[in-house]
Amino acid sequence: MNETANQISYRCPNCGGALTFRPDSANYGCAYCGSRFSLEELEASCGVQEGAEPNPAGETGEQAAGGDQTEGDLVSYSCPSCGAQILTDESTVATFCYYCHNTVILSGRLKGAHRPDYVVPFAIDRKKALSIFSSWIGQKRFVPKSFYDRQQIDTLSGVYFPYLLYRCDIRAHVDTEGRRVSRTSAGSFEEITTSVYRVKRDGTLTKAAVARNALKKRNRLLAEAVQPFDTAALKPFHMSYLSGFVAERKDLSPDEISGEIEREVREYAGSKLRSQLSEYEGISLGEDNIQVSNGSWSYALMPVWTMTYREKGSDRLYYFSLNGQSGKVVGELPVDRGALLRYMLFLFAAVFIPLLALSYFLF
């Protein structure tokens, strides 16, 4: 492992080539000599094991990251492999060197409160992601060829996006009166029978995890719609999982979304409780019927393959995103207006000209 200031690049113990995480085998591979290593072997060869390391007292985010501040909220770093200068924004934690193409992990940005607790590693590699993209785009019509030409496809990137996870215990209870109403018709008469019952329900459940994207930036839309992620696959965070991928750091705090999350949890519990009371009428639920306790927050990185496209002559951004765990695909595609117009003219000609010819002979 090469480490300069707070930049890390994982290197092959056999040949010194760059190591990247391989989703297909869940280990680390060298593109130069073909060696493969498990996480345990990588830690042993590097002679270091990660632990949570808080920021020194009084150290700012930029100082902890080990970079030099530049104009426009960009930070400059030196690549630990070749020394090239790399510019990133303040929330990027893993990127690529434009010169030697090795992954550079900005470890100084992953200290203290900015260090993730968990990561869901990529389960889909680039080859499979490209295959899924090709199948998906093949089902779409009138998409400009420039959206899926070789140059554009090469921009497909594996990105770890930051998420805040909320877990809690929920108690839902009700002790009230409920009515069952039955109606019987006999001729022109209708008999209505109302039975009143005392209804009691009481139960607890643990909400596994409510996930929220923890980015304020515009590119949060790339990660929103590909949810859900299976949080059962969460692993304790290790920076080596970032090798070969890009990563973003959270810039939203739990305090900024706690109200929204608690409302969602209460709505979830209320829907579960109402489903148990559907046979009764006249029961209304309030906040007192649902108690939320033992709430806790954690911070995780989730895998997304994503590609963006900006249409010529327009500021509109189109995108393709693929859940790097489940393979779920979402996207907003541009339309080739020329191809669409030609298709409409073809349909018009195929339908209108035969009708015109038929009317000539009939009339």
Residue ranges of predicted features:
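Short, non-ligating residues that shape and space the ligands of small metal-coordination modules
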Residues: 21-22, 39-40, 88-89, 106-107
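Juxtamembrane boundary at the C-terminal end of a transmembrane helix
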Residues: 354-363
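Short cysteine-rich clusters marking metal-coordination/redox-active sites
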Residues: 12-15, 30-33, 79-82, 97-100
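Charged, low-complexity helical/coil segments in non-catalytic cytosolic or luminal regions
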Residues: 114-314
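Extended, hydrophilic extramembrane loops/domains of integral membrane proteins
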Residues: 302-333
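Residues immediately within or flanking Cys/His clusters that coordinate Zn2+
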Residues: 7-9, 25-27, 72-76, 94
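Juxtamembrane/start-of-transmembrane alpha-helix segments at the extracytoplasmic/lumenal side
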Residues: 333-344
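Cys/His-rich metal-chelating microdomains
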Residues: 16-18, 36, 84-85, 103
